[in-house]
Amino acid sequence: MKDMVFDELKQNMEKGLQALEKSFNKVRTGRASISLLDGIKADYYGTPTPLNQVATLSVPESRQILISPWDTSALNAIEKAIQKSDLGLVPNNDGKVIRISIPPLTEARRKELVKVVRKMAEECKVKLRNARRDANEEFKSMKKNNDISEDQMHDYQDQVQKMTDSYIEKSEDILVQKEKEIMEI
């Protein structure tokens, strides 16, 4: 029974960290990254289709993304989809491929992005703490039903706290790494 609670706790905490990393990937830094285009879908023959399913995406230079559609008739749809996105990217269509130059971030924008990623990290910590609370509630319920003793409950809660501290530390490490990436010129 306790193993199920710990497995669920670990699973929830892993999901929280993965969600944090995924949301960090969508934050634009000064570098070109294909993950910037993850949420963008082009209207391909009337169907909203992810860019990676209609074109080859690559990063030939540190500040440029190259989109080579398999079907050149999709060029305009891809270009429109990028312009509609709120990423502030300007696509350059040369008739065969689309190039997106990533402009360097201003100091003010960098500081703004750091605030955004800190908020995301704080939301992740809240998710981790909620998972901790749920696990502790499970153990209290088990104690109430006399499935475990008071001492066992406290031991399990200590283990839950250690696991929570470990995952919060991991989220801090991810945050520090992202802040460094954003502030890098």
From Swiss-Prot:
GO molecular function, one term: ribosomal large subunit binding
GO cellular component: cytoplasm
Keywords annotated in UniProt: Cytoplasm, Protein biosynthesis
Single Gene Ontology BP annotation: translational termination
One Pfam family from the record: RRF
InterPro entries the record matches: Ribosome_recyc_fac (IPR002661), Ribosome_recyc_fac_dom (IPR023584), RRF_sf (IPR036191)
UniProt-listed CDD domains: RRF
HAMAP family registered for this protein in UniProt: RRF
Keyword ATP-binding on entry: no
Function: Responsible for the release of ribosomes from messenger RNA at the termination of protein biosynthesis. May increase the efficiency of translation by recycling ribosomes from one round of translation to another.
Family statement: Belongs to the RRF family.
NCBIfam families hit by this protein: frr
Name of the protein in its database record: Ribosome-recycling factor
Protein species of origin: Syntrophus aciditrophicus (strain SB)
Gene label: frr
Top-level taxon of the source organism: Bacteria
Compartments, record wording: Cytoplasm
UniProt keyword annotation of Cytoplasm present: yes
